[in-house]
């Protein structure tokens, strides 16, 4: 469950290490984002010579949360931290690699690229 001011790790090689959510997209009063939701983030920590710089604003899709996601069979998939993948203006991933596992809930038309790049799909 991600809300405004939440810090997330970045699960791609775009050059950002940590981002902060400042808006949950999808409704004017929407408060929380879960796995598969798009949020607006600002880069708080970046590596030198990366594709993104500190202070820049991007869209991102949430790929892992501490809260987890409940499946139809009743199982719950949780992670040790919150993570996101940065997106460009066309909603495509900026990085060319994805680090760590992602969930099957991302397998929509929009995020098949992220699922195919991920080393493990849970």
Swiss-Prot record:
Residues passing through the membrane, by range: none
Alphabetical GO biological process terms: translation
Cystines in this chain: none
Cross-referenced SUPFAM superfamilies: Ribosomal protein L14
Family statement: Belongs to the universal ribosomal protein uL14 family.
Role, per record: Binds to 23S rRNA. Forms part of two intersubunit bridges in the 70S ribosome.
Keywords, alphabetical: Ribonucleoprotein, Ribosomal protein, RNA-binding, rRNA-binding
HAMAP family cross-referenced by the UniProt entry: Ribosomal_uL14 (MF_01367)
Protein's name according to its UniProt entry: Large ribosomal subunit protein uL14
GO cellular component term of the entry, any: cytosolic large ribosomal subunit
Subunit structure comment from the entry: Part of the 50S ribosomal subunit. Forms a cluster with proteins L3 and L19. In the 70S ribosome, L14 and L19 interact and together make contacts with the 16S rRNA in bridges B5 and B8.
Cleaved signal peptide residues: none
UniProt entry tagged with the keyword RNA-binding: yes
Species per Swiss-Prot/TrEMBL record: Stenotrophomonas maltophilia (strain K279a)
Gene Ontology molecular function terms on file: large ribosomal subunit rRNA binding; structural constituent of ribosome
InterPro entries: Ribosomal_uL14, Ribosomal_uL14_bac-type, Ribosomal_uL14_CS, Ribosomal_uL14_sf
PANTHER family the record matches: 50S/60S RIBOSOMAL PROTEIN L14/L23, LARGE RIBOSOMAL SUBUNIT PROTEIN UL14M
Domain of life of the source: Bacteria
Gene3D superfamilies linked to this entry: Ribosomal protein L14 (2.40.150.20)
């Amino acid at each position: 469950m991600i809300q405004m001011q939440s810090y997330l790790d970045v699960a791609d090689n775009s050059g950002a290490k940590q981002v902060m959510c400042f808006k949950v997209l999808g409704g004017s009063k929407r408060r929380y984002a879960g796995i598969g939701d798009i949020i607006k983030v600002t880069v708080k920590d970046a590596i030198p010579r990366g594709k993104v710089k500190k202070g820049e604003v991007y869209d991102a899709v949430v790929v892992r949360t501490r809260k987890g996601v409940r499946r139809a069979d009743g199982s719950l998939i949780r992670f040790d931290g919150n993570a996101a993948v940065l997106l460009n203006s066309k909603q495509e991933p900026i990085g060319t690699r994805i680090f760590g596992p992602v969930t099957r809930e991302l397998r929509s038309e929009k995020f098949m690229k992220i699922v195919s790049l991920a080393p493990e799909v849970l």
